[in-house]
């Protein structure tokens, strides 16, 4: 599996014939680099778009990318219906605890401690529950994108049930857990092959770098991968 980070919480997974975007926040993302050409490359051939929750910095360019590529959107029911009201036609709704079969892989929505909603005419429209996302494909590492969340005790059950190999962990503080708490979550609950920090280095009110997270896991034996934005890393 090749994993590409685009800044903030936006990722792309490439394995076999599947090209999966998670939280495709490009337009307006201060951390996204390369402009229109980089965006075109990031979304090229996308087959699926997975969204952890209904906030603008995670829904991002979903409608535009789905229109450009025909990618299927997989997310919680309420957010799917809201996107459908905006013109989305190819979607697969689900909810917390559920699993959907996408053919080459399965998607499961798990718990996250956060909120979800978008502002319309000055009023916040609730968009279902926030989630983490588990991606499982035969012969590939199991990926757990935590979405936006704090640490919570039932991460132990996520480890017991899904045994993720790759964690995408929000570390930016203020809107999610910060570096030390995120490192505690990784050490206490998981045994991954690799951990990729995210949700930092974008907006000035969250952590500017992953340095504190990397330091907090120093000596743990856990591999922390801090990718260069837009450059794929391979996880066996």
Curated annotation (Swiss-Prot):
What does the record give as the organism's lineage?
A: Bacteria, Pseudomonadati, Pseudomonadota, Alphaproteobacteria, Hyphomicrobiales
Protein family according to the UniProt entry: Belongs to the UPF0173 family.
Entries under PANTHER family matching the protein: UPF0173 METAL-DEPENDENT HYDROLASE MJ1163, UPF0173 METAL-DEPENDENT HYDROLASE MJ1163-RELATED
What is the protein's name according to its record?
UPF0173 metal-dependent hydrolase Mnod_3315
Q: Would the keyword Hydrolase turn up in this protein's UniProt record? A: yes
The cysteines covalently paired via disulfide bonds are: none
Which InterPro entries did the record assign? Metallo-B-lactamas, RibonucZ/Hydroxyglut_hydro, UPF0173, UPF0173_UPF0282_UlaG_hydrolase
UniProt-listed SMART domains: Lactamase_B (SM00849)
Q: In Gene Ontology terms, what is one molecular function of this protein?
A: hydrolase activity
Keywords recorded for this protein, A-Z: Hydrolase
């Amino acid at each position: 599996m090749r994993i590409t980070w685009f800044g903030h919480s936006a990722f792309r997974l490439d394995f076999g014939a599947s090209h999966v975007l998670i939280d495709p926040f490009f337009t307006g993302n201060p951390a996204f680099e390369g402009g229109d050409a980089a965006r075109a490359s990031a979304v090229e051939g996308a087959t699926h778009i997975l969204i952890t929750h209904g906030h603008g910095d995670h829904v991002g360019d979903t409608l535009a990318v789905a229109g450009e590529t025909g990618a299927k959107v997989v997310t919680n029911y309420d957010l799917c219906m809201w996107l459908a009201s905006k013109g989305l036609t190819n979607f697969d709704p689900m909810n917390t605890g559920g699993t959907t079969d996408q053919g080459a892989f399965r998607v499961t929505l798990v718990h996250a401690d956060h909120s979800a909603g978008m502002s319309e005419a000055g009023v916040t429209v609730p968009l279902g529950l926030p989630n983490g996302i588990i991606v499982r494909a035969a012969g590939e590492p199991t990926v757990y994108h935590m979405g936006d969340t704090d640490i919570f005790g039932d991460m132990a059950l996520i480890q017991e049930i899904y045994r993720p190999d790759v964690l995408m962990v929000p570390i930016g503080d203020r809107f999610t857990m910060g570096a030390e708490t995120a490192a505690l979550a990784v050490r206490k609950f998981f045994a991954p092959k690799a951990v990729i920090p995210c949700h930092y280095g974008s907006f000035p009110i969250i952590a500017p770098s992953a340095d504190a997270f990397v330091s907090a896991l120093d000596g743990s034996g856990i591999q922390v991968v801090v990718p260069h934005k837009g450059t794929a890393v391979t996880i066996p």
